[in-house]
């Protein structure tokens, strides 16, 4: 990721940084308008996810997560910014005239060629089934269900590792630290998702975060008792209980929120690390 630092003319530009060498000029046939409803509310209008709201209007880019252009070579034409995700996207021109967006693999540059299929080279950006990959391969955009498209390891900088193959299943170590089984026939893309340093970029000011649809974060201890279990008291008061709690009164730190008796419990060999 190429970072451009501003000259220190104002406090905002002194601390801010933007991505350079990445344009945002999407193709008209690969975008469509998307109504962003809710803003962290449920169907009754009650806040269920805090600190969300506002933000600039966005056009959704159609991303090819399935990579079903089999055995047809494509060339990376552009590397573009996508407002709907932290990762960059690449515009691919295939040999049969098809044009699609894919997630930008880290290290890929304009002019590189990619291909998807069953017997393709183990090269960055190529997509192939897990059964054809050697152990230790770094992968992203991993399918959970055959033919449904990649669902795992799609965020900026995400990378998983193929650590074992036995029977009909392959064992993967995911970015969260979770180790789980997936069918060997599912496909994945070789390499790591690009823009790995996005979490180190400084926005510089509150307005830049508002453009992204992120509202200010307020501590519960400075709220009123009606708004948060930590609220109330005179001056700087402690939270008034043994353990921290969420705004709805549930234990805040370390409580497991995964549903019990899920179908995938037998597929998870080791839970994700905190």
Swiss-Prot record:
Gene Ontology CC terms, in alphabetical order: chloroplast; large ribosomal subunit
Example of a GO biological process term: translation
Key words of the record: Chloroplast, Plastid, Ribonucleoprotein, Ribosomal protein
Annotated HAMAP family: Ribosomal_uL2_B
InterPro entries: NA-bd_OB-fold, Rib_uL2_dom2, Ribosomal_uL2, Ribosomal_uL2_bac/org-type, Ribosomal_uL2_C, Ribosomal_uL2_CS, Ribosomal_uL2_dom3, Ribosomal_uL2_RNA-bd_dom
SUPFAM superfamilies: Nucleic acid-binding proteins, Translation proteins SH3-like domain
Gene Ontology molecular functions: rRNA binding; structural constituent of ribosome; transferase activity
Quaternary data: Part of the 50S ribosomal subunit.
Name listed for the protein in its UniProt record: Large ribosomal subunit protein uL2cz/uL2cy
The family this protein is said to belong to: Belongs to the universal ribosomal protein uL2 family.
Cellular compartment(s): Plastid, Chloroplast
Cystine connections: none
Organism, scientific name: Cucumis sativus
């Amino acid at each position: 990721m190429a970072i451009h630092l501003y000259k220190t003319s104002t406090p905002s530009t002194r601390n801010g940084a933007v991505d350079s060498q990445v344009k945002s000029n999407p193709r008209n046939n690969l975008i469509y308008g998307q109504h962003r409803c809710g803003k962290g509310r449920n169907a009754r209008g009650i806040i269920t996810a805090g600190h969300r709201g506002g933000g600039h209007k966005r056009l959704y880019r159609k991303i090819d997560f399935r990579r079903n252009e089999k055995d047809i070579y494509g060339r990376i034409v552009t590397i573009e910014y996508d407002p709907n995700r932290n990762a960059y996207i690449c515009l691919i021109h295939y040999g049969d005239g098809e044009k699609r967006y894919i997630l930008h693999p880290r290290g890929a540059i304009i002019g590189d060629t990619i291909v998807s299929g069953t017997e393709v080279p183990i090269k960055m950006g190529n997509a192939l089934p897990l059964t054809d990959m050697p152990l230790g391969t770094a992968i992203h955009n991993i399918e959970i269900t055959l033919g449904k498209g990649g669902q795992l390891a799609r965020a900026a900088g995400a990378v998983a590792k193929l650590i074992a193959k036995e029977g009909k299943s392959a064992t993967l170590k995911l970015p969260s630290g979770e180790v789980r089984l997936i069918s060997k026939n599912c496909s994945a893309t070789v390499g790591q998702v690009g823009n790995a340093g996005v979490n180190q970029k400084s926005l510089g000011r509150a307005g830049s975060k508002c453009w992204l649809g992120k509202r200010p974060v307020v501590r519960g201890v400075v709220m009123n008792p009606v708004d948060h279990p930590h609220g109330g008291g005179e001056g700087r008061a402690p939270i008034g209980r043994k353990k921290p709690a969420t705004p709805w009164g549930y234990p805040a730190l370390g409580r497991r929120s995964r549903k019990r008796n899920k179908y995938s419990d037998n597929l998870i060999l080791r839970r994700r690390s905190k």
